[in-house]
């Protein structure tokens, strides 16, 4: 299970709208000062993803929840998104090269195959998105932001 913390934006009728920050690098290792990934992360836009997750328990905006998604579904979707355009590119380029015996035809076939593979991946991803095992789930819920209070006694404050 791949896990990530998210912040609740709203909750209505058993559906929680949560926001996840995009992290391209962790910024936690000792070599972060010379890390190329960290530098690239600072250059890009700081974006968030907002998704709807089913949740029977009422949630408060600002509350933290831990989301989880199965590794198998993530690997399958990555395989679909990356491999189908690549396979389409090679297959149609090879077919056009055999049929027309021209590099220009092979180039056109590669472009058409890549676009076709992308469209196939997009169509299948919409079908797979409806499956329950491809949906993120809420694994744990943190306390609401205003529930925890720290008080110090006057004796501790004077010392």
Swiss-Prot record:
Note whether Membrane occurs among the keywords.
Answer: yes
Q: Where are the transmembrane segments?
A: 73-95, 99-121
List all topological domains (Periplasmic): 96-98
- Share any extra remarks: Part of the rseD-rpoE-rseA-rseB-rseC operon.
Pfam families from the UniProt entry: RseC_MucC (PF04246)
Q: Which domain of life is it from?
A: Bacteria
Q: What is this protein called?
A: Protein RseC
Q: Which InterPro entries match?
A: RseC, SigmaE_reg_RseC_MucC
Organism of origin is Escherichia coli (strain K12)
């Amino acid at each position: 299970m791949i896990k990530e913390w998210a912040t609740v934006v709203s909750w209505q009728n058993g559906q929680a709208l949560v926001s996840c920050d995009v992290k391209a690098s962790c910024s936690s290792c000792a070599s972060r000062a010379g890390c190329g990934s960290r530098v690239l992360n600072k250059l890009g836009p700081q974006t968030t993803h907002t998704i709807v997750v089913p949740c029977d328990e009422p949630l408060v905006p600002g509350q933290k929840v831990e989301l989880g998604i199965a590794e198998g579904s993530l690997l399958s979707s990555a395989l679909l998104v990356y491999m189908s355009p690549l396979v389409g590119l090679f297959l149609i380029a090879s077919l056009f090269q055999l049929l027309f015996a021209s590099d220009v035809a092979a180039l056109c076939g590669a472009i058409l195959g890549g676009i076709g593979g992308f469209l196939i991946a997009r169509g299948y991803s919409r079908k797979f998105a409806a499956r329950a095992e491809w949906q993120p789930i809420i694994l744990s819920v943190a306390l609401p932001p205003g529930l925890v209070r720290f008080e110090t006694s006057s004796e501790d404050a004077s010392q």
